[in-house]
């Protein structure tokens, strides 16, 4: 054990014992005084949020202590966490799955306990190791939809000592070949429900990567063999699964994210992140071995894989899987699985609010809805309609070293993605910060006359940075992307507050309020400049949505290029609740909204387009990049109807004559 580990180990034990002692003394006193001074303690908690701190800190210290021991014993991998839960919670459900039936809207509930899952995984490990020659250290791709088979493959690869890479099952062609190549994939295991893109790309894969094996699984036959108690099993030797040279910042899995070139990047999920990181995250969101986390998010993304599966399975609870997201059957599946927690991302909550009332939407057991991307304008509406007690909005990036969280109840902290008590805030101040941006270019971090960055003042947008604790070995905190050193290096900024320090750049703008809460504002690429001013797309979207909540089902704002003008002009894309409205009705809607907008002229959307559907990613996030490429005046195919804000006073249809005048600059924007 290194000197630093010894110090951390000792301090964690001391602080843990100290907190236990204080908690032992304070708890009965607090209960007694609570009867007399209940309102005072409530106000104190509202101001300092000490209750959640008392809940989080002892567990965090205990986890750090146990993790250091596990690292010392070379037992830091998630496989050993899984074994622990098999031993302690063998009869508890580990996985449930609402398998879609032929009849639309009907499901067959499949369940597997921890001991059943363990036995299946050992049988599948035998097949993978002896029939397919999967070896420890191999990078093996899983191309699978949401179903128990995905988790069985995942755990089997961990048992063998291989590293799973989660392919987006919609990827095909060049991006698919690129994904396999940069990750040194040896073979791919393919779910029959996800096989079409691979089959379409098979010739391209074989030409570019002839050594990569494509294994098309027959799920029904395979599951029959895995459920047979007479099938042979394989448990890898510990010293092969976890060789002495393996460190806890090495890859536990690979998850693909979108790249700036249009090709995916393979983000490294370290063992530290997927094990102790997800354990602590689960505790912060009050997961226990009695909890069930329902996710309709794809397992090939980190939200479902790390913050769903890894988090709940490390606590001995149940992972409930939906085959894919369906707004119309969401609450029925939640009810069938008995979920206590549900995951959301992007616009999922808005989709659910726009569904007809279902008898299942209040028959569930859900206490916590957690995810990222819940907008403040529907935060309380979502909670009230679906009877959700707690919102767990978090901020994280797939490749980021840490996440921020909130456990929000009541009216305080709506919209925040980081909300802790005074003690944890102080601790996190050494780990996370918001830095000021250049007033002339909000994609550039501001540096003062000494060449250092400055913390963003309260209320001012700043880029979130996360500390890299060993600047000379940044991979111990931030592992980056496999096979892409350039992109990895671009995410690290140095000499931030002193010479030699290093921080991970999140690439997002957040702001802090006077209570220490943090709020997500924009992706760095989403903010645009017009008339030499920075425009927050989130602010404009929120105001535009609020101006007509009944008619505007979904609103997107981006900046688009206008020939002969510097910067980008505001462009709003609107999906209506009623798509049958004609141009006259749409014009009236826009001008009614205009009177309710409280935006400076430079932030007003100069151009507007109505669409039947806003294009989304596979993980239900808006594809803003597509809309940033909007061509004026009629789109690429010449069929778009675009509205424009004439003289900043009234919306009208953009005609050919209007565009000629704008292009000739006889009309100024």
From Swiss-Prot:
The keyword Nucleus does not apply. Coiled coil: none annotated. Keywords: ATP-binding, Cell membrane, Ligase, Lipid droplet, Lipid transport, Membrane, Nucleotide-binding, Peroxisome, Transmembrane, Transmembrane helix, Transport. ATP binds at residues 256-267. Pfam families: AMP-binding. GO terms for molecular function: ATP binding; long-chain fatty acid transmembrane transporter activity; long-chain fatty acid-CoA ligase activity; very long-chain fatty acid-CoA ligase activity. It is a multi-pass membrane protein. It comes from the Eukaryota. The keyword Transmembrane helix applies. Residues 1-5, 170-270, 340-669 are cytoplasmic. Acyl-CoA synthetase required for both the import of long chain fatty acids (LCFAs) (C14-C18) and the activation very long chain fatty acids (VLCFAs) (C20-C26) by esterification of the fatty acids into metabolically active CoA-thioesters for subsequent degradation or incorporation into phospholipids. The transport and fatty acyl-CoA synthetase activities are genetically separable and are thus independent activities. Esterifies VLCFAs in the peroxisome matrix. The VLCFAs are actively transported into peroxisomes by a PXA1-PXA2 heterodimeric transporter in the peroxisomal membrane. Interacts with fatty acyl-CoA synthetases FAA1 and FAA4. This is Very long-chain fatty acid transport protein.
């Amino acid at each position: 054990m290194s000197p630093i580990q010894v110090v951390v180990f000792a301090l964690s034990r001391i602080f843990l014992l100290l907190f236990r002692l204080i908690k032992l003394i304070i708890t009965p006193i607090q209960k007694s005084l609570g009867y007399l001074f209940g309102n005072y303690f409530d106000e104190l908690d509202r101001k300092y949020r000490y209750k959640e701190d008392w809940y989080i800190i002892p567990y965090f210290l205990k986890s750090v202590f146990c993790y250091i021991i596990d690292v010392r014993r070379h037992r830091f991998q998630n496989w050993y966490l899984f074994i622990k839960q098999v031993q302690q919670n063998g009869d508890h459900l580990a996985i449930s799955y609402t398998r879609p039936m032929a009849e639309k809207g009907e499901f067959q509930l499949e369940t597997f306990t921890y001991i059943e899952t363990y036995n299946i995984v050992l049988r599948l490990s035998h097949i993978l190791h002896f029939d397919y020659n999967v070896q420890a250290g191999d990078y093996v791709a899983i191309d699978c939809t949401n179903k128990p088979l995905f988790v069985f493959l995942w755990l089997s690869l961990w048992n063998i000592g291989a590293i799973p890479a989660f392919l987006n099952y919609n990827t095909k062609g060049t991006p698919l070949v690129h994904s396999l190549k940069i990750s040194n994939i040896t073979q791919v295991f393919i779910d029959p429900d996800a096989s079409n893109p691979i089959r379409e790309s098979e010739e391209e894969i074989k030409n570019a990567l002839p050594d990569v094996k494509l294994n098309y699984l027959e799920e029904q036959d395979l599951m029959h063999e895995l459920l047979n108690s007479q099938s042979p099993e394989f448990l890898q030797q510990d010293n092969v699964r976890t060789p002495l040279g393996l460190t806890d910042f090495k890859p536990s899995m690979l998850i693909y994210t979108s790249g700036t070139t249009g090709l995916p990047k393979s983000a490294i999920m370290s063992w530290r992140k997927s094990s102790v990181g997800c354990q602590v995250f689960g505790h912060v969101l009050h997961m226990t071995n009695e909890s069930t986390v329902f996710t309709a998010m794809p397992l090939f993304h980190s939200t479902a894989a790390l913050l769903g599966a890894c988090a709940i399975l490390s606590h001995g609870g149940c992972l409930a899987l939906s085959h894919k997201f369906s707004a119309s059957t969401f609450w029925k599946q939640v009810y069938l699985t008995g979920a206590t927690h549900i995951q959301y991302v992007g616009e999922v909550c808005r989709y659910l609010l726009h569904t007809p009332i279902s008898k299942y939407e209040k028959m569930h057991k859900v206490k916590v809805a957690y995810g990222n991307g819940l907008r403040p304008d529907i935060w309380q509406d979502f909670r009230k309609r679906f009877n959700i007690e707690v919102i767990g909005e978090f901020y994280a990036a797939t490749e980021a070293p840490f996440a921020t969280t909130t456990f929000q109840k009541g009216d305080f902290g709506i919209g925040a993605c980081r909300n802790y008590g005074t003690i944890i805030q102080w601790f996190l101040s050494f780990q996370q910060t918001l830095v000021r941006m250049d007033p002339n270019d909000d994609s550039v971090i501001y540096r003062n006359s000494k060449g250092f960055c400055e913390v963003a003042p309260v209320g001012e947008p700043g880029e979130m940075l996360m500390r890299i604790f060993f600047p000379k070995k940044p991979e111990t905190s931030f592992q980056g992307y496999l096979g892409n050193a350039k992109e990895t290096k671009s995410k690290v900024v140095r000499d931030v507050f002193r010479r030699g320090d290093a921080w991970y750049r999140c690439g997002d703008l957040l702001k802090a309020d006077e209570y220490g809460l943090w709020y997500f504002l924009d992706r760095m690429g989403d903010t645009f400049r017009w008339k030499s001013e920075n425009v927050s797309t989130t602010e404009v979207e929120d105001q535009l949505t609020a101006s007509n909540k009944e008619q505007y089902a979904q609103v997107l704002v981006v900046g688009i290029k206008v020939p002969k003008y510097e910067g980008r002009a505001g462009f709003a894309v609107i999906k209506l609740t009623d798509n049958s409205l004609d141009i006259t009705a749409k014009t009236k809607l826009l001008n009614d909204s205009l009177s309710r907008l409280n935006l400076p002229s430079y932030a007003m959307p100069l151009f507007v387009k109505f669409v039947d559907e806003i294009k989304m990613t596979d993980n239900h996030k808006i594809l803003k990049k597509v809309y940033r490429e909007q061509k004026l005046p009629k789109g690429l195919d010449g069929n778009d109807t675009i509205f424009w804000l004439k003289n900043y006073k009234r919306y009208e249809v953009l005609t050919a004559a209007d565009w000629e005048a704008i292009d000739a600059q006889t009309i100024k924007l």
